[in-house]
Regions:
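Functional transmembrane helices that form membrane-embedded active or gating regions
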Residues: 131-135, 201, 205-232
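Short, small-residue-biased leader/transition segments that mark boundaries at the very start
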Residues: 2-9
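Structural signal for the C-terminal ends of transmembrane alpha-helices
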Residues: 51-57, 111-123, 165-175, 202-210, ...
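Short hydrophobic alpha-helices at membrane interfaces in multi-pass membrane enzymes
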Residues: 127-143, 176-182
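Interfacial loop-to-helix transition and helix-capping segments at the boundaries
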Residues: 30-40, 86-107, 146-175, 180-198, ...
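Transmembrane alpha-helical segments and their boundary/interface "anchor" motifs
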Residues: 35-44, 53-109, 126-133
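Juxtamembrane/transmembrane-helix boundary motifs at the membrane-water interface
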Residues: 10-40, 75-100, 144-149, 212-216, ...
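Hydrophobic cores of alpha-helical transmembrane segments in multi-pass inner/ER membrane proteins
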Residues: 42-50, 104-116, 162, 196-204, ...
Length: 238
């Protein structure tokens, strides 16, 4: 997805005597591997996001941090994926046609906040109260999913659905894993790939224990930094 790098790499390999068929065979394999890594990583981010929301001691700070990294990551994201960053191109200060995944996760957190507020406002153990609560919470998920699509976040409504589903089913890893597979098929219309199955297995095996909090921000910073490094590497082929 790094604009321009594919053409430069292609020209280099073709000049070395590789056939077009050979190049695109390798290129497709590389793309599948990279896409596969992202396919595994995103649902795991959604899982950890929902877990973090449940266990964090300061939700405002948690949500604020997600928004901060969404803003920090947007410039590297715009430059790395669209290769243009100027007022003339309409990409300054942000390219509004597509937003990075931190915005998706931020909206996912807001969804969970509203879902919990709805649960607190609609009290009662009766059947009517439970049905009303579920319908209202489902309505919140749908509205936030629509917003994610309108804002044009990476993964869009799919991200909101994943975060919400994993939060609702957090008491059972088996239900989370099965729910993820079902939601993947519902939101994409595709059969699960090997990468989706791997992600589902990792969700199933997750023990729920908190990891080393000292490296938490390493993973936050990794996203904008690795995009910048990949874009810089793509310039070497020009």
């Amino acid at each position: 997805r790094l604009v321009g790098s594919e053409m430069c790499i292609r020209d280099r390999y073709l000049a070395g005597g590789m056939s077009t068929e050979q190049f695109y065979g390798i290129d497709a394999f590389q793309k599948n591997i990279l896409n596969g890594i992202g396919t595994i990583a995103f649902p795991l981010f959604c899982l950890l996001l929902s877990e973090g929301f449940f266990y964090t001691k300061n939700r405002k700070r948690y949500i604020g941090g997600m928004l901060a990294f969404a803003l920090i990551s947007e410039v590297p994201f715009d430059i790395g994926f669209f290769s243009r960053y100027s007022i003339a191109e309409g990409t300054f200060p942000f390219y509004l046609q597509y937003q990075n995944v931190f915005f998706t996760l931020f909206l996912g957190l807001l969804t969970l906040v509203i879902i919990e507020k709805v649960a607190l406002k609609i009290s009662g153990d009766g059947r009517k109260s439970k049905v009303t609560k579920i319908l209202c919470q489902l309505g919140v998920v749908i509205i936030m999913a629509i917003i994610a699509e309108l804002v044009k976040c990476d993964y869009g409504s799919q991200g909101i659905v994943y975060v919400s589903m994993l939060y609702f089913l957090r008491k059972s890893r088996l239900l989370q894993s099965a729910g993820f597979l079902i939601m993947y098929m519902v939101t994409t219309g595709n059969q699960p790939t090997i990468f989706i199955v791997v992600a589902a297995l990792i969700i199933l095996l997750y023990n729920g224990k908190r990891g080393n909090l000292s490296i938490k921000y390493f993973f936050y910073w990794f996203y904008p930094v690795h995009i910048s490094l990949l874009y810089g590497a793509s310039l070497l082929f020009k």
